[in-house]
Amino acid sequence: MSALNKLLLYLVLPVILLVGGAAATVYLWVNGPLALPTERVDILVPPGSTPSSIAQLVNQAGVPLNVQGFVALARLGELDTKIKAGGYQIVRGDSPLTVLRRMALGDVTARQITFVEGWNLRQIRAALAGHPDIKQTLAQVSDADLLKRLNTLGQAVSLEGLFFPDTYIFPIGTSDVELLERAARTQQKILDRAWAARAPNSVLKNPYEALILASIIEKETGQAADRARIAGVFSNRLRINMLLQTDPTVIYGLGEGYTGKLRKQDLLSDTPYNTYTRLGLPPSPIASSGRAALAAALNPEKHNYLYFVSKGDGSSAFAVTLPEHNKNVATYILGRKP
């Protein structure tokens, strides 16, 4: 071998090895198994998702995935515009390429169900019963037995309000009870965090009271901007031992007896949930409450308002005194100018 050839070999070989090593590294990453924290991880891909946003969702779910690498892989494979929305499962052994191809094919092996903020237990049960991919077992379990299993608070008197409103992804054949257990665990975690972050002077005595008040706030709030202020009204009333006088609790107490329009006789009809006839909070939540309602219940706006009324556009008018409130009622409910 000539001196020139030796020189060329010394110069070129490291480059070849470097390129080859890099190619091997890329190949192993593209086809190698992802590190999952559990046997499977559920991912909900919203409509309009990009490879970048999907990679971020995967990372948030506890699965390390290089965002730039995933984006490059999608573009090189011309799969970036083919990704379909839906619920997907990542299982042990899946590689970045496997996940990407599954989403491009729309291989939605998982199903999903959504519990909406403000739904009551009856509505949640109906959603579960109407889902074709959920195993129906609730008929075999009494509410009392289910409450024993799910009452992590130790103070709940009913199942109402124990299930966090969210979208849950699950494999076909998951039972309704399993989904309720999952929603209850989620609610407990979120409630624990909200309780830990409560205002130091909160009028609420325990997390269950927070869940009860949050459910009322959830039903009373028409616009998000009013949520903390509405929470402040109820906190002020509780603090001075004033009737809460909130219609949603009355409606809940009427149950199937509610005709769709609240009448004066309904407000006078005493039930454990009638906050026009009974002081304090009702015995249980009246609906499922989201994060924002819980945060408002535990960190209400500080003010002197004791009254509020809906303006008819989703927002509310607030008042400190009853005469001021009556003017607001005349303006927004009775249609009279002040």
Where are these regions (language model features)?
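Short, Lys/Arg-rich N-terminal segment immediately upstream of the first membrane anchor
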Residues: M1-L7
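Short low-complexity stretches enriched in small and charged residues
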Residues: L9-L13, R40, T81-K82, W119-Q123, ...
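Hydrophobic membrane-insertion alpha-helices, especially the h-region
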Residues: Y10-A23
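Signal peptide-directed extracytoplasmic domains
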Residues: A22, Y27-L191
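Bacterial extracytoplasmic/cell-wall-associated proteins, especially those involved in peptidoglycan
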Residues: T50, A126, G130-K135, R149-P338
